[in-house]
């Protein structure tokens, strides 16, 4: 390697270094200017310490290699440790408290959890929009301050259920924000001053600590308030308080909880408010882009409430936010340091521990990546098809690797929602068209002095916007979104009959549900649902070419919230003639409210009639106090509405009404896909289940089932059972990879066996039905996991497991899933995880019912495996046994017959060949089928040779399986049973014997006699039991020939 080059940079002065080369008010701009002068890597000296800055994508790509570099906490960020200590953002590399908090919190920021926060995000965003709407289009809006209010209130509400209500105090920012801004600014100042200068700034230091204590006091108050709540919501704060680290089993300390509450409140709002501020600055500076973004929102959302699905369908908004962050990364850098001395870019030597700052405002404008127009705002470059082609680590505004922003998904959903909602609601212009962008710097950046004006779009009013937000809040969905025909929304199957419009007034959702039910019924009669919407949507919008059905109630004597405008419209007397409109009204009420009983349905019916509308049918009514509303609706439909509709509005040609299938549903059934991947599987239906053991004993179960056809089974044969994985194990996988159960996964691979190919499968189904989750990890799996972690500590531990594979991994049955939970820093893609999993295999069980005993039926006798895992933590759940234990009478499962080895069947001549059966626990299963087969022969008056059953268990009242049945068989002369009780050998029936080998000794003479008659000995059970029995028998009988001594070990 050639000699390392000297890192360029401005020449430092003695003592002060480059302090005077930097504008203290605009330090970031000064440092970015150095990048233009000195190239991709430069250094400056501040306070006697060298600070190195990387400014190109190529160097950032190297610095993001977590095998070589890790996060460094320096300068301003290190000063913030006074506030947040080892919180997620300020912790040193490898700090233990950070590890515990990170492992607890990562699952809580999964996509489903973030998606579920959308309603609370919308709540706060609507407060912002209402504020702007009420201020009017002439008001100058400090957009940065309002976005700070917005994002602070959002993070507090969504993650902690805590309302700061910042929009209700327009004069000052929340005290937490005031303290935060001071602390951030002071940290930035201290980072750029020599230590001696900081030491004499006593007043500033005192004020710094005062503000820190104020912030921690507020965080402590939030925590104390939550702890008083006996029914806390399942949010991030609840996770902080009650979560357990999957590695150490520890929870977070109170100080760590406070540190991370503060971290969320700062990091969760400060950078997002900057992102939104810069985004709207760029949009207003580029009206054609603003117009295009607004058109995307109009086309996708309209006036509906913005949903998570809408956000996924706004690619241009997504690109705008990415481009805004590229040009103005609100957290303008992050710092890493090499684990050992490294040569960066093949030119510059960086010593171990030397911090290197990734200067994002320069890196993200690298012309070699973004082209000669890299300084221009052009969102198209960030559309998915272009973004995916960028070189690695070209866009890093959220940091890197395991120390990257844990709340990225939260911030992104919030930003998308706010941009879409503002564009949906307002037209925007700058307050000062001559404004030139100025940057306000703390440890983050925001526009300084940027103000706008916002005017409501499309004739909306502040009152209308307020009412719309209230309707959304009460009904949970936008009323306007229901204006379109139901067929277009997929609420109902398409039909071609006479159209009908349904309007409802509903606060609690009852009348809305009744309307949906009636519309569904009408479709089965040959009518088409044209509209299904709240009554307020019918103002000046009642159709004349089709019947109108209204279903509504009275709320405190008044119309429901979504019927107020409609009733007011009718009451004003300004209604144009409703002549030509045909209608019917169905009203709901409760007779306890005697003064207002059916008031609004009656009022609507009368007013419409007086305005010239034609009443199709007498008004229907349902009294919730004495009847079922849906039954009353059906009665009105049959006796009043349908006859009137048939007389005046003929439906399309339709079949007669089928009461068993009123909606004419057509469907087809097929067996589960997993069944097709195994040959010869037969469907069985469970007919009986029972637990055979006492509650305080390891559980054993009996499961009886029926099937069709003759399977040519014999006593002693086996069944291969197709199981599914335990739900708790599947849940562990879903949590590990932040998947909702109904996420779809499509596998496209020629190398993956046992999985549906090129077919969407839900995550729950895939991990339940197609792969082994608890198979011990292989050596190759360990190699892959080593490659997937950046942590040297974890690598060392995994290498230790690799070196002691047989004893630590294989013998203790440690799975890949176990290892991922044990070492959360392993970053394993889900595709790699799936590729490590073998196909789910069938499990083999012995028949415990003789085929001749009950034709077309059989049974299984099995132990339910639920025991402490051999790895030392958690539970080991037997896949098939827990699946079988979950089945109930009527359940369907799948099996295939599997013959036992030929010697493990009854003798060809049961009249002349005695048998001796030796077993313990569920090893009784095949011998039960032997005995039942002999019982059938006995009932046929056929002679039988002697049969002995030696059975071991814990005790008579614990797990003496099938005691009553065996007693009946014994009384019939089919078998003689000899028992051993390991827990209660003092029982007479056990003859003092704990184990079957002991009982063999006490029955030695009988065994010798049967052996002399060419008896066959069968053994079924565990290895230890079989070895003990064999030792006794060899000592008693001598050599045991294979054809007369047959074993089946499990």
UniProtKB/Swiss-Prot annotation:
Enzyme Commission number(s) from the entry: 1.14.14.1, 1.6.2.4
UniProt-annotated binding residues for FMN: 506-510, 585-617
Entry cofactors: FAD; FMN; heme
Record Pfam families: FAD_binding_1, Flavodoxin_1, NAD_binding_1, p450
Residue ranges annotated for the Flavodoxin-like domain, each copy included: 500-641
A cellular component term, taken from the record's GO annotations: cytosol
Cofactor descriptive note: Binds 1 FAD. Binds 1 FMN.
Alphabetical list of InterPro entries matching this protein: Bifunctional_P450_P450_red, CysJ-like_FAD-binding, Cyt_P450, Cyt_P450_CS, Cyt_P450_E_grp-I, Cyt_P450_sf, FAD-bd_FR_type, Flavodoxin/NO_synth
The entry's keywords: Electron transport, FAD, Flavoprotein, FMN, Heme, Iron, Metal-binding, Monooxygenase, NADP, Oxidoreductase, Transport
One Gene Ontology MF term: aromatase activity
Domain of life: Eukaryota
Entry binding sites for heme: 405
Annotated FAD-binding FR-type domain residues: 679-907
Catalytic activity: 2 oxidized [cytochrome P450] + NADPH = 2 reduced [cytochrome P450] + NADP(+) + H(+); an organic molecule + reduced [NADPH--hemoprotein reductase] + O2 = an alcohol + oxidized [NADPH--hemoprotein reductase] + H2O + H(+); dodecanoate + reduced [NADPH--hemoprotein reductase] + O2 = 5-hydroxydodecanoate + oxidized [NADPH--hemoprotein reductase] + H2O + H(+); tetradecanoate + reduced [NADPH--hemoprotein reductase] + O2 = 7-hydroxytetradecanoate + oxidized [NADPH--hemoprotein reductase] + H2O + H(+)
Region (Disordered), start-end ranges: 461-495
Task of the protein: Self-sufficient cytochrome P450 monooxygenase that catalyzes the regioselective in-chain hydroxylation of alkanes, fatty alcohols, and fatty acids at the omega-7 position. Performs hydroxylation of C10-C16 n-alkanes and C12 and C14 fatty alcohols; and thereby enables the one step biocatalytic synthesis of rare alcohols such as 5-dodecanol and 7-tetradecanol. Converts 1-dodecanol into 1,5-dodecanediol as major product with very little sub-terminally hydroxylated products with the 1,4-dodecanediol and 1,6-dodecanediol more abundant.
Family, as annotated: In the N-terminal section; belongs to the cytochrome P450 family.
Name of the molecule in the record: Self-sufficient cytochrome P450 monooxygenase CYP505E5
Source organism per UniProt: Aspergillus kawachii (strain NBRC 4308)
